[in-house]
């Protein structure tokens, strides 16, 4: 899911008329799928701003569903993603919201099954680039351009240092890191973008640290 050099300007190869409305939308959906870790049974997509005005004509709805099915931006199946999802028995609902977003190309995705639910807000900033701005009520800034680790934890002294020590042990270089929390001493979310894909055994070691609740990753 990484794009470099000229692709950062003109956008990746994509199915659809606009890199912001299709490639970016597909990547938002794919990040949600990656974090959820499995195919959802129910999908609710809420469109804001420009997305709300043009999502049907520009294929934004199709692109997001394609991403949620784990299709890449150049996958021809994106064109029929909604039909494919419905054939799988996935329940899909699109909503147009009146609220004025900070960025015009904004979508909120809620996906769920009998095991759980995930809510994610993403923006498409042009050229196929995206930012994830909210995850399950936590504010964050996640580009989707690099492998990332997301750590849900209790806001306790030494937790961040413990995670950093594990990453240093395996020579994992951190490109960007931030922490959001509900309140002092409550649930927190650590977002860590790194320079290489993370093996599962590293995630296992992170998950065994004190105060860690859940560890997930986004692969490159």
From Swiss-Prot:
Residues 148-220 form the ACT domain. Gene3D superfamilies: 3.30.70.260, D-3-phosphoglycerate dehydrogenase, domain 3. The keyword Calcium does not apply. InterPro entries: ACT-like_dom_sf (IPR045865), ACT_dom (IPR002912), ASB_dom_sf (IPR029009), Fe-S_L-Ser (IPR051318), Fe-S_L-Ser_bsu (IPR004643), Ser_deHydtase_bsu (IPR005131). The keyword Transferase does not apply. Binds 1 [4Fe-4S] cluster. It catalyses: L-serine = pyruvate + NH4(+). One of its GO terms (molecular function) is L-serine ammonia-lyase activity. Keywords: 4Fe-4S, Gluconeogenesis, Iron, Iron-sulfur, Lyase, Metal-binding. Pfam families: ACT, SDH_beta. It comes from the Bacteria. Its EC number is 4.3.1.17. Belongs to the iron-sulfur dependent L-serine dehydratase family. Heterodimer of an alpha chain and a beta chain. This is Probable L-serine dehydratase, beta chain. It comes from Bacillus subtilis (strain 168). The gene is sdaAB.
